[in-house]
Amino acid sequence: MAKVAAIVLAAGKGTRMKSELVKVMHPLSGMPMISWPVNVVREAGAAVITLVVGHQSEKVREFFADQGDIVFASQEEQLGTGHAVACCSEALSGFTGAILILCGDVPLITPETLQTFLEYHYRQQAVITVLTTCMDNPYGYGRVIKDAAGHVTEIVEEKDASAEQRQINEINSGIYCVDAGFLFTAVADLKNDNAQKEYYLTDIIKTAVAERRTCCAFPIADPMEVMGVNDRVQLAEAGRIIRVRINKALMVAGTTIIDPETTYIDHGVVVGRDTTIYPNVCISGGTVIGDNCVIESSAVIKGCKVGDCVTIKAGSVMEDSVIGNTVAIGPMAHLRSGTELRDEVKIGNFVETKKIIMGAGSKASHLTYLGDATIGSHVNIGCGTITCNYDGVKKHRTVIEDDVFVGSDVQFVAPVSIGRNSLIAAGTTVTKDVPPDSLAIARAPQVNKEGWKLKNK
């Protein structure tokens, strides 16, 4: 295929979102909304992508700053789509080939559709091809006017359309493929003599027709692909459609999702074969989950790397953690950022971890806080154990070596180190290092006063 560039229009504020955040930067299934059309034109073959920015341009520029195929064009005053494209003339100066043009609030268009669209444009040897669709209720959309041969002669906006033209149900999607040599000459000559007093990009069709050049329509069957997102209702609907696509792709690849409608998996998440995901699970942040895992209901997993044969029980929350193979987590466990669990570790109910390394085969089965700690292999952490890691100013680490047994209700006042094969008696508060092969016990001796209750009645 010939060389292709793309223009993504992203300068508008999006007032109907009722938000301080510019519309195209609203999150959608793990990415800002504008990332969806940008990624799609890239997959469709665009060698260079020009983003037209205006409102909160610094947020858009910052997000895409490290993506070398993206350049920016500023539209300080929003005077219409034609004006927005004209702002790209310098950024695309000297480019020859086809230019894809679409809006930054159209996240559902697919790479396959755009690739077919481009191929059609070249086959027809058109100067302009408009991607269109038919709608049962086309209110608010520009209508596509054609001649007897089926070529596009005009696109008329809703407010400028006659009663007869409003009966047409083939609408302009706002996605175009235009010959670069024609495009910037045509937009430079646009006028704003319309109801909106804007420079309509669609008016370049009149120029092409006057020059007896071919303008084509490329209709697609699914109107949802070209749905624009203008408010939070449409944002939620777009998220639902993307979620269906993500979950379907995972299921086709070998993941079992018990109830796809209540399973929320973001773009960029990888899940292995024969893993089962139960309802009301949320997985995000580029999480990678291995094969043969079980993710029970209401688990929340963000930015984690999970090995094979891992069970994450109901209600567990995990973020920025690394999990080995054959690990059991939860129910109701909380793995905070910096947690690393080696193979065959068990983290039970109401256990919280943060910035720890826990060696293979170690267990913390219930009601425990482990923070800023290095724990060896085959260590048993008893119920109610706490690493006291914060002195009010700084965080300190606890080190527990291999094969240590920690009884219930133990506090480690960091910094402290426990030697291998030691035993920490239940109820002990550890304030100094424990040598290897030792018993540490630090609690007041039990005193029984017989008959005490009778005397004090």
From Swiss-Prot:
Binding site for UDP-N-acetyl-alpha-D-glucosamine: 9-12, 23, 75, 80-81, 142, 157, 172, 230, 336, 354, 369, 380
Keyword entries, A-Z: Acyltransferase, Cell shape, Cell wall biogenesis/degradation, Cytoplasm, Magnesium, Metal-binding, Multifunctional enzyme, Nucleotidyltransferase, Peptidoglycan synthesis, Repeat, Transferase
Gene Ontology annotations for the cellular component aspect, listed alphabetically: cytoplasm; membrane
InterPro entries in alphabetical order: Bifunctional_GlmU, GlmU-like, GlmU_C_LbH, Hexapep, MobA-like_NTP_Trfase, Nucleotide-diphossugar_trans, Trimer_LpxA-like_sf
Region listing for Pyrophosphorylase, in residue ranges: 1-232
Binding site for Mg(2+): D105, N230
Record localization: Cytoplasm
Cofactor info, note text: Binds 1 Mg(2+) ion per subunit.
UniProt pathway annotation: Nucleotide-sugar biosynthesis; UDP-N-acetyl-alpha-D-glucosamine biosynthesis; N-acetyl-alpha-D-glucosamine 1-phosphate from alpha-D-glucosamine 6-phosphate (route II): step 2/2; Nucleotide-sugar biosynthesis; UDP-N-acetyl-alpha-D-glucosamine biosynthesis; UDP-N-acetyl-alpha-D-glucosamine from N-acetyl-alpha-D-glucosamine 1-phosphate: step 1/1; Bacterial outer membrane biogenesis; LPS lipid A biosynthesis
Residues that coordinate or bind acetyl-CoA: N389, Y390, S408, A426, R443
Cofactor requirement: Mg(2+)
Region (Linker): 233-253
Reactions catalysed: alpha-D-glucosamine 1-phosphate + acetyl-CoA = N-acetyl-alpha-D-glucosamine 1-phosphate + CoA + H(+); N-acetyl-alpha-D-glucosamine 1-phosphate + UTP + H(+) = UDP-N-acetyl-alpha-D-glucosamine + diphosphate
GO biological process: cell morphogenesis; cell wall organization; lipid A biosynthetic process; peptidoglycan biosynthetic process; regulation of cell shape; UDP-N-acetylglucosamine biosynthetic process
GO molecular function, one term: magnesium ion binding
Catalytic residue positions: H366 (proton acceptor)
Enzyme class: transferase
Domain of life: Bacteria
Quaternary organization: Homotrimer.
Family per record: In the N-terminal section; belongs to the N-acetylglucosamine-1-phosphate uridyltransferase family.
Protein name: Bifunctional protein GlmU
Native species: Geotalea daltonii (strain DSM 22248 / JCM 15807 / FRC-32)
